[in-house]
Amino acid sequence: MMRISLKTRIVCLQLCLTLASTLQAADKFVSFIREEGTLELVTSQQRSFSILCADEEHKGVLTAVHNLQEDFYKVADIRPALVADAKQKGSADGQNVRILIGSFDESPFIKQLVKSKKLDARELKGKNEKFIITTVKDPVEGIPGEVLLIAGSDKRGTIYGVYELSRQIGVSPWYWWADVPVKKHKTLYVDAPTTVSKTPSVKYRGVFLNDEDWGLKPWAAKTFEKERGNIGPRTYAKICELLLRLKANHLAPAMHPVSTAFYKIPENKLVADTFAIVMGSSHCEPLLLNTASEWNSKTMGPWDYGKNKDKINEVLGNRVKENCAYENVYTLALRGLHDAAMGGGDVPMKEKVKMLESALKDQRNLIAEHIDRPVETIPQAFTPYKEVLEIYSNGLELPDDVTIIWPDDNFGYMKRLSGPHEQKRSGRAGVYYHVSYLGVPHSYLWYSTTPPALMYEELRKAYDTTADRIWLANCGDLKGAEMQVSLFLDMAYDIDSFNANNVVTYPARWLAKMFGDQYYSVFEDITSSHINLAFSRKPEYM
């Protein structure tokens, strides 16, 4: 076994820590020690303050602000008041406004700041999911003094800015799902030279909850949602919150027959809308329909497009109609029930291509019928997974605006990337990537061991060939894949902050953020050894 000298290890560690600080220091604006010129949020004398956020704000922003109030309580044992009017009693009378939060497209306070030229509209107007964090003096009438401003280009931009403040005061995105401890602080200060976030690298970034039979579903049924006995709105609320704290925006819900289908519980979609999550469905669920548990062959007839086309289209049309008021990415698909091929193996390939093209055309027509927008502007995705990839490769024609989501081989290696012709498509491309898998030849469900270096290599190749529209990670039932989910979503948010060198230290840095930099060298040794061993042979295969 090769031994690395202590001197070499120290130099490497210093390099890694320098890199880690470089990645984070640019946007660090919260401190726990008073410095000259800092804005006081919490001190021994200042034990209360207010957050100003207009009632007109998006529901998702108000939800995030309420969570921010609770985050301050976790850290400093104070719960800031929330006021919606600069002249509201309590805002300038005792409970001073110290934080102003608003979206460029909704907040009257942000519009006032732009009008008074205290905020540069060029950084926000027309931008996707960007935020600005800075300090402003006398921001609006009725609010004297200096405040911390969090302004977003749109609702999710504002939400990400809010949760960035939560992260910097010490609340991990995984505080609930992984019980990451929150360190208490008696003082909180802000020094915020203007921080402007990047536009996310990938437009829709999220996870697909899958194979929930052994973990997520029984846990929800027996502990968190006993009254429902299944995965329901309370569980999905916690998942939506986690995604937003990780700067994601997209969710494909659990779909095995063991759990109640997402849209069979009306509150579920209301929860997603309240959090501002864009819903979708997996590669085998057309137009948000969970065919595995929602299609009843006894009452609806066979799930066979060749034999039962009219009924299939009727059910799919109803699903679009029921959900057209919400943000969705619509999957275009025609597969058998529960991740199986449709039709017999003796069907000629030309007939398979013709049938799939016809089904996708019908689905597009249903979208156009029920949504009052040009169909070309509505997010749609097609995933050539398993046998569908062969059909696609045999000449399947897709509308140019549909996003092709390229799958991996279930083990982290991309099966295909966009070629020169596909790179010209207006719908661009996406990625469907496994960090958990149930199927042949081998499953891996205990916990995720996909190497970060492999993830970066494969996802970067995909991104560089126009896969920047949708990234969806199959994360199983979430638990056991926390690090890989974080890495996947961090790369989807800012792929250019990663390279082949710094991605290998990601697990150690990820753990150090939670438990302290003093343990970094220990984490680096453990994670690198663990990843190398598990790459040789996954624990599930022993």
Explain the meaning of each model-derived region.
Residues M1-K28:
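Bacterial Sec-dependent N-terminal signal peptides
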Residues L119-G306, C324, A381-P384, L396-Y413, ...:
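Feature activates predominantly on carbohydrate-active enzymes
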Residues D55-H66, G152-R156, N230-R234, F262, ...:
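Soluble non-cytosolic domains of exported or imported proteins
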Residues L82-A84, V182-V190, H256, Y263, ...:
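Gly/Pro-rich turn-and-neighbor structural signature
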Residues G60-T63, N67, D71, G157-E164, ...:
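Extracytoplasmic/secreted proteins, especially bacterial periplasmic and envelope-associated proteins
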Residues S48, D154, I169-V171, Y330-L337, ...:
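Aromatic-residue-lined binding/catalytic grooves and analogous aromatic/hydrophobic interfacial grooves
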Residues A25-T199:
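Contiguous, structured surface segment used for ligand recognition
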Residues P193-S197, E294, L334, Q363-M542:
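Substrate-binding groove of N-acetylhexosamine-processing glycoside hydrolases
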